[in-house]
UniProtKB/Swiss-Prot annotation:
Pfam families: UCR_14kD
Name assigned to this protein: Cytochrome b-c1 complex subunit 7
Swiss-Prot/TrEMBL GO biological process terms: mitochondrial electron transport, ubiquinol to cytochrome c
Keyword match Mitochondrion: yes
Amino acid sequence: MAYLRTGAEFIASYRSSLNRMSDLQQKIKMFGFNNAYYNQVGLLKHDWLPHSPVWLEALRRLPRELQEARDFRIARASLLYASKHVLPKEQWTTIEDDIPYLEPYVNVVVKEMSDRSNWDNFVNPEIYSE
């Protein structure tokens, strides 16, 4: 299977969805984002979300460079948390850089699980055609 990549069109559509928000929605989103702790230690949103079987499978399918970048962000955040420090403000994750990088992989895994479930519950119609 060819690796999915977080393509330029996906990033552009995510950023344009931020721009289409009303002024009040943008202010609320920025308030929540700026008061969150994860961006102050350099994490992305998908780095700290709770793991489920779908997320674990999506993480397993990540390309090596994305896995290594994620591992680095988590290790750095753990060290910062343990020492009760945050990154300098210039190094904080911005809302434009907080791309949902796992979303394409999660969508593929959900579709595959749905297809597998449909095939597992398939009943041959010839049995009932008497």
